[in-house]
Amino acid sequence: MKPCIFTGSAVAIVTPFCGDGVDLEAFDRLIERQIQGGTDAIVVCGTTGEAATLSYNERMALIERCVRTVDRRVPVIAGSGTNSTASSIALSKAAQSVGVDALLTVTPYYNKASQSGLVQHFSAIADAVDIPVILYNVPSRTGVGCTAQTYQALAKHPNIAGVKEASDDFDLIQDTLNLCPPGFTVWSGNDGSTAAIMALGGKGVISVAANVVPREMHELTQLCLENRFLEAGTLQLKLHELIRALFCEVNPIPVKAAMELLGLCSGELRLPLCRMSERHLEQLSSALKPFRSSV
């Protein structure tokens, strides 16, 4: 059986900007806050980290900085997927060379590859590296999704460790868990589905909300891992309004606003993303109030 890269809550960490550049000092502070808050792994340069608007040099600077600052205290997972197989391989190999523990590779967006194309794409990336690869299925953003049969085929690859499943398709998730061997791990890609997916056999979440409430997301996943699902359900419900507010506009617009409201980093975004509406900002500010004392 393949070893599980992490169980629990991995933060999909935001990228703090400062003018035209990345604020690496603020990034260090965010990493330390996550580790102190009990986060079980850190995902750098994912969707929430605005990877699509980062240059190659910026991505590598963030990945290297994360590896150095974390210093082996928790696993570091680098987002290395693009809609070009060759570019994804190059970024994956570069991330491996600076010491990341695993890679997160999104389904190629815009191209709308067939299932055979997806198998070949992910297999080519996994062939090119010697560290675990996590698939990332988010069809609402990419325009294409994996089937359970595709996961079953990919699960045979020794370097493919599992999937961040952000489709919220529970038929797909159950089929995947039934078809794939136990060593193929499923992680929730949606904060609001964490307890439900873990009740089916998922091992944790790659979380947006953990940027704001790392302790609570860690606690939620630990309760699930301990089969304390009644308590987990209570905490999931407590987090519901906050999670809803964090997705009232497209991610990561609300979470960047939340980080600024809490004084954790600038809420600056890169175009084509822009700041959220005043109406939604009021909703977010209200949802944050019960958690301000824990931040």
Across the structure, where does each feature detected by a protein language model lie?
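Active-site beta->alpha loop and helix N-cap motifs at the rims of alpha/beta catalytic domains
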Residues: 2-11, 15-143
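Catalytic alpha/beta core domains of metabolic enzymes, predominantly
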Residues: 127-128, 139-247
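Gly/Ser/Thr-rich beta-alpha loop segments that engage phosphate groups in nucleotides
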Residues: 10, 48-51, 81-83, 145, ...
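C-terminal alpha-helical cap/extension of soluble enzyme domains
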Residues: 8-16, 33, 37-39, 199-202, ...
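Alpha-helical structural signal in soluble globular domains
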Residues: 37, 61, 65-70, 94, ...
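Alpha-helix N-capping/helix-start residues
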Residues: 19, 24, 56, 148, ...
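Short secondary-structure transition/capping segments
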Residues: 54-57, 90, 115-118, 146-148, ...
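A general structural signal for well-ordered alpha-helical segments in protein cores
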Residues: 27, 59, 63, 88, ...
